[in-house]
Structures are given as C-alpha cells and as structure tokens.
UniProtKB/Swiss-Prot annotation:
The lineage of its organism: Eukaryota, Viridiplantae, Streptophyta, Embryophyta, Tracheophyta. GO terms for biological process: cellular response to oxidative stress. It comes from Oryza sativa subsp. japonica. Its main location: cytoplasm. It catalyses: L-methionyl-[protein] + [thioredoxin]-disulfide + H2O = L-methionyl-(S)-S-oxide-[protein] + [thioredoxin]-dithiol; [thioredoxin]-disulfide + L-methionine + H2O = L-methionine (S)-S-oxide + [thioredoxin]-dithiol. One of its GO terms (molecular function) is L-methionine-(S)-S-oxide reductase activity. It is found in: Cytoplasm, Cytosol. This is Peptide methionine sulfoxide reductase A2-2. One of its GO terms (cellular component) is cytosol. Signal peptide: none annotated. Keywords: Cytoplasm, Oxidoreductase. Coiled coil: none annotated. The keyword Oxidoreductase applies.
Length: 190
C-alpha cells in the first residue's frame, strides 16, 4: 500500500496528507492504531492509565469524510483506527505498542477473527520520527515471537475521520467498565 502523498504533501487530496489535528491537552501526544474492530481496541486503551482520551474512526484512506457504511463497503481504503491522546510521561509509547500487540493477531492480512476486510488490517500510524523508530523496533522484537510473518503496516498517520457518535465509547455505553486499571474481560459487544 503506497503512502505517497505527492509533491504537494497531500494538498490535492487532503486524505493523503498527515493528520494535522492537535492532541486534546497540553503535554499530550497522539497515536493511531488499527487492530480489527475498533470497539474493543478503544476500550482497552480507555482503561490504560496515562491515556487521556480515545476516539474511534477511519484513517489511511482516500475517500473524503467516509462513513462507517462507506468504509465497510471496501472502496475507501480506510482502516478502522483508534486515535489515542496520551501523556508520554505517564504512559510511554512503548506501553501503547505492548497493548496493540497483545490485542490482536498481527499475522493476518485483512482480518481479525471473524471480521474480514481491508478496514480490519493491522497498522501502526505514527506522528513523529521517534514513534516510527520505536514502532519498527517493537515489530522486529515481536517478529521473533511469531512463527508466521507479521503483516502490520507502519506508516505516517494520515487524516483522521471520527466515526459516527454511535461508535464512540461503544462498549462503555453498553455497560463495560472503562475505569483506569480495570482488568475485567472485554466482551465483544456491549
């Protein structure tokens, strides 16, 4: 999958440009992860101390302002992602990566469990050169643990489109705890 934004840095198609949004507070940084259906991935990050905010949505595609139905239709190129606003002093990026690797199977190309489609691919989308370095080192270390080849893509974070409000904090709205440090098993649906 090409990540070429062209000579204009994505100006001709803003969806190919970088995610230029700011983190939700002073001292916070952003990270994006694709690891299958975003509902349970989001709840996992919500529970993590040092994470100030999570959002589910779509990134890495080429369709302007996609909806959930657009993305599920397979024509937009987007992945379902969780965008994490985190305090790197309280929760280093490496901890976010540990959660990412533990949450899904990074050796399946376009599926996680029963869910199939390019929107369910495995991806780490970085905002800084340091995030890229740590992500690539993390992938190399994880590859030593897997017999199958890891297919996780590591690319610059592109423009983020929030999913419809219905999807935000979906499992928490369905009664599952998002309390920091909670270790209750995550049920797939609320």
């Amino acid at each position: 999958m090409s990540n070429d934004t062209g000579a204009d840095g994505g100006a001709a198609n803003p969806d190919l440009g970088p995610d230029a949004d700011a983190a939700a507070g002073e001292g916070l940084e952003l990270a994006q992860f694709a690891a299958g259906c975003f509902w349970s991935v989001e709840l996992t990050y919500q529970r993590l101390p040092g994470v100030a905010r999570t959002e589910v949505g779509f990134s890495q595609g080429h369709h302007h302002e996609p909806t959930y139905d657009d993305v599920c239709g397979q024509g937009t190129g987007h992945a379902e992602v969780v965008r994490v606003h985190y305090d790197p002093k309280a929760c280093p990026y490496g901890v976010l990566l540990d959660v990412f690797w533990a949450k899904h199977r990074p050796t399946t190309l376009i599926r996680q469990g029963d869910e199939a489609g390019t929107q369910y691919r495995s991806g780490i989308y970085y905002y800084t050169a340091e995030q890229e370095r740590v992500a690539r080192e993390s992938l190399e270390a994880k590859q030593e643990e897997w017999k199958e080849k890891i297919v996780t893509e590591i690319l610059p974070a592109r423009r983020f489109y929030p999913a419809e409000e219905y999807h935000q904090r979906y499992l928490e709205k369905g009664g599952q705890s998002a309390q920091k440090g909670c270790t209750d098993p995550i049920r797939r649906y609320g």
